Amino acid sequence: MADGNTRFTVDEALVAMGFGKFQIYVLAYAGMGWVAEAMEMMLLSFVGPAVQSLWNLSARQESLITSVVFAGMLIGAYSWGIVSDKHGRRKGFIITAVVTFVAGFLSAFSPNYMWLIILRCLVGLGLGGGPVLASWYLEFIPAPSRGTWMVVFSAFWTVGTIFEASLAWLVMPRLGWRWLLAFSSVPSSLLLLFYRWTSESPRYLILQGRKAEALAILEKIARMNKTQLPPGVLSSELETELEENKNIPTENTHLLKAGESGEAVAVSKIVLKADKEPGFSLLALLSPTLMKRTLLLWVVFFGNAFAYYGVVLLTTELNNSHNRCYPTEKQLRNSNDVNYRDVFIASFAEFPGLLISAAMVDRLGRKASMASMLFTCCIFLLPLLSHQSPFITTVLLFGGRICISAAFTVVYIYAPEIYPTAVRTTGVGVGSSVGRIGGILCPLVAVGLVHGCHQTIAVLLFEVVILVSGICVCLFPFETSGRDLTDSISASKEPPSASV
């Protein structure tokens, strides 16, 4: 047995064991959840127009079908984040899988518009648990390869969007939208089927003082990866910090830099309370230690969601509006198959987006990757301020989707990294909730304004939101590439030399 004074943290254990068979299983499970969410989101591009013609809905009623999903996600992302920080990651994502599958399957039997709205809102409530799965997966990944493997995880979203576009192309013309809804709920059921083989996050367990359980899971990882744990005793990051600082009462008491004593005691109580009781984690997100990164992240999540789903909806809406808003032009759209083709082609834009983010995320860092992609997306959308041909429109939206999907991929890597384990899923969940507000407003612009032949105003709004998001990325306090994840809020202060 190693010297009892030798200690190792979860991060050190994960680095020592490397990325192996255990992480592949975790990736497959979390990836299936990401496929499920992507499919449920992408089908909105097809179901809305289908029920609009079936039930004679107005443009506002059609856009509401998408907006209520985001409204449900707004509530769900916050709620499931709190649940998973308080009761564990596994309990958080199993509840969301049940809600998503049941509501998604039942929505195929909606007898009228109101029932469809209610059930799709419940689907959104379940889909709000997506950040819990992402955080759970992240907490098993060794720091040196975290960026690359998070991009691989994001590839499952791309697989889901392409699979949904293919499924819609095959199912909609023959069987209709109800069958599409039923088939799209299948991936969520697989999460229920394989749930019993999942493991709780060792980071969460050790933060709760359940060291024996955390150690058992780390030993399981070592066995499956055919490696060994570091010598010594498993220790939490907070214990290590307190041990190192036990002879420095000023910093240990205040948990803040010198000169902030006026509010130090109050803040330290919030921080320590959040470390022990996740119910206080929302308050901790707005403490001086985390406030700047939290507010900036909210803006970036809003902008990414608003732009991403906007580009998805514009792929069908802009080309459909050409004949309506420019009646003197040659009628180019003769069948609904063209819409399926456009969405199918546009979905493939996410593959180069993934490749770009994979190439940039560890080399250039998270911040530079996000900012460059957001600003480039602005350039692609700029010509759409005026009317373009359907071909040029599709090409520009293809380029815009490459960029915004790359930016969205990186923000889902960066967001969990800037928060400690004590508030990670709450922080990402609340940020994702703010992003859902962007999703709620997005159809009002991409569908409502475009239907009203206000393409210039719609595209201008997207340009402004994306530009502001890019600026906020530049203002993030530090880079996370290659850094260890922190567990306690008190250990998550900005590094002395934050990279820009």
Swiss-Prot record:
PANTHER family: MAJOR FACILITATOR-TYPE TRANSPORTER HXNZ-RELATED, SYNAPTIC VESICLE GLYCOPROTEIN 2
Pfam families: Sugar_tr
Topology term for the membrane: Multi-pass membrane protein
Binding site for ATP: Y137, L138, E139, F140, I141, P142, A143, P144
Designated gene of the protein: OCT7
Subcellular localization, as worded in the UniProt entry: Membrane
Signal peptide positions (record): none
Organism in which the protein naturally occurs: Arabidopsis thaliana
Homology family: Belongs to the major facilitator (TC 2.A.1) superfamily. Organic cation transporter (TC 2.A.1.19) family.
Extracellular topological domain: 45-62, 119-120, 172-174, 315-341, 388-401, 451-456
Stretches that traverse the bilayer: 24-44, 63-83, 98-118, 121-141, 151-171, 175-195, 294-314, 342-362, 368-387, 402-422, 430-450, 457-477
PROSITE patterns noted in UniProt: MFS, SUGAR_TRANSPORT_1
Stretches in topological domain Cytoplasmic: 1-23, 84-97, 142-150, 196-293, 363-367, 423-429, 478-500
GO biological process: monoatomic ion transport; N-methylnicotinate transport; nicotinate transport
Function in brief: High affinity carnitine transporter involved in the active cellular uptake of carnitine. Also transports organic cations.
Principal cellular location given in the protein's record: membrane
Tissue-by-tissue expression: Expressed in pollen.
Alphabetical list of InterPro entries matching this protein: MFS_dom (IPR020846), MFS_sugar_transport-like (IPR005828), MFS_trans_sf (IPR036259), Sugar_transporter_CS (IPR005829)
Gene Ontology CC terms: plasma membrane
Glycosylation sites: N56, N319
Gene Ontology molecular-function annotations: ATP binding; N-methylnicotinate transmembrane transporter activity; nicotinate transmembrane transporter activity
Name of protein: Organic cation/carnitine transporter 7
